[in-house]
From Swiss-Prot:
Disruption phenotype: Cells lacking this gene accumulate aklanonic acid methyl ester. The lineage of its organism: Bacteria, Bacillati, Actinomycetota, Actinomycetes, Kitasatosporales. Keywords: Antibiotic biosynthesis, Isomerase. This is Aklanonic acid methyl ester cyclase DauD. It holds the Pfam family SnoaL. Homotetramer. It is an enzyme of class 5 (isomerase).
Length: 161
């Protein structure tokens, strides 16, 4: 394997083991996966990646793992073809745990800069996973609770005597 693919395999290993104490060795301080912004909009770098690993294990159980299907590279880019296996045990964008097992293929595009992972986009099989989970509905609070409606203030200037 190439050094770039080895870096991506370290990323996959972190997702599989949940071990994140060494991610600064292979995740650049500018790391960003736009798909993770929903969970931690302010985080970047190794901390953002570690939070994504923690979330994966929280939502899909400690046994969740990525199976390596194949890797390709083109310049600074690595394309990883993976399959995620897990069990829905935690809140998933407002949908309470179903306990159901699922699997789904994914494509990850990863850019290596200065010998570390900088950019990461992933496209999981959302539809297939959703169906395997039994097509659950979010709780009333959803994944983005609505703020309470603004309190109406009484405008005394319109009062008539």
């Amino acid at each position: 394997m190439s050094p770039q693919i080895d870096l991506v395999r370290r990323m996959v290993e972190a997702y599989n083991t949940g071990k994140t104490d060494d991610v600064a060795e292979f995740i650049l301080h500018e790391y960003l996966n736009p798909g993770a912004l929903e969970h931690n909009p302010e985080l970047r770098g190794p901390e953002a990646f570690a939070a994504a690993v923690t979330w994966l294990k929280y939502a899909f159980s400690e046994e969740a793992h990525l199976e390596e299907i194949g890797y390709e590279e083109n310049g600074p880019w690595v394309r990883a073809k993976l399959a995620l296996y897990g069990r829905h045990v935690g809140n998933l964008v407002g949908m309470p745990a179903t306990g159901r097992r699922f699997s789904g293929e994914q494509i990850h595009l990863i850019r290596i800069v200065d010998g570390k992972i900088r950019d990461h986009r992933d496209w999981p099989d959302y539809l297939g996973t959703y169906r395997q989970l039994g097509e659950p509905w979010p709780t009333p609070e959803g994944w983005r609770p609505c703020p309470p409606p603004p309190r109406r203030r009484h405008d005394r200037s319109t009062d008539t005597p």
